[in-house]
Amino acid sequence: MKKIAVLTSGGDAPGMNAAVRAVVRYGVRQGLEVIGVRRGYSGLIDGDFVKLEYKDVAGITEKGGTILRTSRCEEFKTEEGRELAAKQIKKHGIEGLVVIGGEGSLTGAHLLYEEHKIPVVGIPATIDNDIGLTDMCIGVDTCLNTVMDAVQKLKDTASSHERAFIVEVMGRHSGYIALMAGLVTGAEAIIVPEIPVDYSQLADRILEERRRGKINSIIIVAEGAASAYTVARHLEYRIGYETRITILGHVQRGGSPTAFDRRLALSMGVEAVDALLDGEVDVMIALQGNKLVRVPIMEALSTKKTIDKKLYEIAYMLS
């Protein structure tokens, strides 16, 4: 193997740049030519390639986002689109591809291998932390720290005004961010997709806390469980006083990655290159315990990952 490529796809996650840097620098050290694909799978279809040298990735570890840019590509979801991408790969003599992204990106990588035998290795990078067989994905730790900081600031103002604040965080199918953020900030309630919410019970609990002298409440909601506005409407009807809504949105994706995310991304980038050189393809690099392992991409994607119900109960008891 003499030439490999790397791309970032889907939603960005803090630490993607660190992974790109590791793939490039370690690849060059192994005597490989490394090509960067701009704009994810859209760039793969269009042939938007750039050769990356050692110096091109200097100083990017600490930067959020991705220097390669990213996109969500509808064309790549079609067989015709993937065929165009495969032709570009072969035309440019690329012998292996590292894909950094979430569920959709990794599915695309698997299809490239299944349909066109393109050697691929995936690196999980998504703040939702919803990919199976890996304890953590790149970007999750940074996102949690961002949410924790924001909620702590909201608690300051909530206590000043004796209000209930409803904070909506990302998590379409997974309540991981909501659960962990709620646990570490002492939120009064956590609403996640995995557990049905009873608004009457929630309102009763907040009112009981009021009777005990607690003058403010923080409710953290995963976007996939309910909208913050829906929660606010139900609560205001039942508790009789106003709430305030904060939707953190895309601020959760940004920021300089934490030390944990940097280390994870750098290690996964190196392992991905090694996997290609070893001929172990159609695999994803996963963190299990304190070790990096290689697992089949589709096995990871077909393994349902859910929140820790016991941890949810602990968060409830400690709030």
Swiss-Prot record:
<dbReference type="InterPro" id="IPR012003">
    <property type="entry name" value="ATP_PFK_prok-type"/>
</dbReference>
<dbReference type="InterPro" id="IPR022953">
    <property type="entry name" value="ATP_PFK"/>
</dbReference>
<keyword id="KW-0479">Metal-binding</keyword>
<dbReference type="InterPro" id="IPR000023">
    <property type="entry name" value="Phosphofructokinase_dom"/>
</dbReference>
<dbReference type="InterPro" id="IPR035966">
    <property type="entry name" value="PKF_sf"/>
</dbReference>
<feature type="binding site" description="in other chain">
    <location>
        <begin position="126"/>
        <end position="128"/>
    </location>
    <ligand>
        <name>substrate</name>
    </ligand>
</feature>
<dbReference type="GO" id="GO:0070095">
    <property type="term" value="F:fructose-6-phosphate binding"/>
</dbReference>
<feature type="binding site">
    <location>
        <begin position="72"/>
        <end position="73"/>
    </location>
    <ligand>
        <name>ATP</name>
    </ligand>
</feature>
<keyword id="KW-0547">Nucleotide-binding</keyword>
<feature type="binding site" description="in other chain">
    <location>
        <position position="212"/>
    </location>
    <ligand>
        <name>ADP</name>
    </ligand>
</feature>
<keyword id="KW-0460">Magnesium</keyword>
<protein>
    <recommendedName>
        <fullName>ATP-dependent 6-phosphofructokinase</fullName>
        <ecNumber>2.7.1.11</ecNumber>
    </recommendedName>
</protein>
<feature type="binding site" description="in other chain">
    <location>
        <begin position="250"/>
        <end position="253"/>
    </location>
    <ligand>
        <name>substrate</name>
    </ligand>
</feature>
<dbReference type="GO" id="GO:0030388">
    <property type="term" value="P:fructose 1,6-bisphosphate metabolic process"/>
</dbReference>
<dbReference type="GO" id="GO:0005945">
    <property type="term" value="C:6-phosphofructokinase complex"/>
</dbReference>
<keyword id="KW-0418">Kinase</keyword>
<comment type="similarity">
    <text>Belongs to the phosphofructokinase type A (PFKA) family. ATP-dependent PFK group I subfamily. Prokaryotic clade 'B1' sub-subfamily.</text>
</comment>
<feature type="binding site">
    <location>
        <begin position="102"/>
        <end position="105"/>
    </location>
    <ligand>
        <name>ATP</name>
    </ligand>
</feature>
<feature type="active site" description="Proton acceptor">
    <location>
        <position position="128"/>
    </location>
</feature>
<keyword id="KW-0808">Transferase</keyword>
<feature type="binding site" description="in other chain">
    <location>
        <position position="155"/>
    </location>
    <ligand>
        <name>ADP</name>
    </ligand>
</feature>
<dbReference type="GO" id="GO:0005524">
    <property type="term" value="F:ATP binding"/>
</dbReference>
<dbReference type="GO" id="GO:0048029">
    <property type="term" value="F:monosaccharide binding"/>
</dbReference>
<keyword id="KW-0021">Allosteric enzyme</keyword>
<keyword id="KW-0963">Cytoplasm</keyword>
<comment type="subunit">
    <text>Homotetramer.</text>
</comment>
<feature type="binding site">
    <location>
        <position position="244"/>
    </location>
    <ligand>
        <name>substrate</name>
    </ligand>
</feature>
<dbReference type="GO" id="GO:0042802">
    <property type="term" value="F:identical protein binding"/>
</dbReference>
<dbReference type="InterPro" id="IPR015912">
    <property type="entry name" value="Phosphofructokinase_CS"/>
</dbReference>
<feature type="binding site" description="in other chain">
    <location>
        <begin position="170"/>
        <end position="172"/>
    </location>
    <ligand>
        <name>substrate</name>
    </ligand>
</feature>
<feature type="binding site">
    <location>
        <position position="103"/>
    </location>
    <ligand>
        <name>Mg(2+)</name>
    </ligand>
</feature>
<feature type="binding site">
    <location>
        <begin position="21"/>
        <end position="25"/>
    </location>
    <ligand>
        <name>ADP</name>
    </ligand>
</feature>
<dbReference type="GO" id="GO:0006002">
    <property type="term" value="P:fructose 6-phosphate metabolic process"/>
</dbReference>
<keyword id="KW-0324">Glycolysis</keyword>
<dbReference type="InterPro" id="IPR012828">
    <property type="entry name" value="PFKA_ATP_prok"/>
</dbReference>
<comment type="pathway">
    <text>Carbohydrate degradation; glycolysis; D-glyceraldehyde 3-phosphate and glycerone phosphate from D-glucose: step 3/4.</text>
</comment>
<feature type="binding site">
    <location>
        <position position="163"/>
    </location>
    <ligand>
        <name>substrate</name>
    </ligand>
</feature>
<dbReference type="GO" id="GO:0016208">
    <property type="term" value="F:AMP binding"/>
</dbReference>
<keyword id="KW-0067">ATP-binding</keyword>
<comment type="function">
    <text>Catalyzes the phosphorylation of D-fructose 6-phosphate to fructose 1,6-bisphosphate by ATP, the first committing step of glycolysis.</text>
</comment>
<feature type="binding site" description="in other chain">
    <location>
        <begin position="186"/>
        <end position="188"/>
    </location>
    <ligand>
        <name>ADP</name>
    </ligand>
</feature>
<dbReference type="GO" id="GO:0061621">
    <property type="term" value="P:canonical glycolysis"/>
</dbReference>
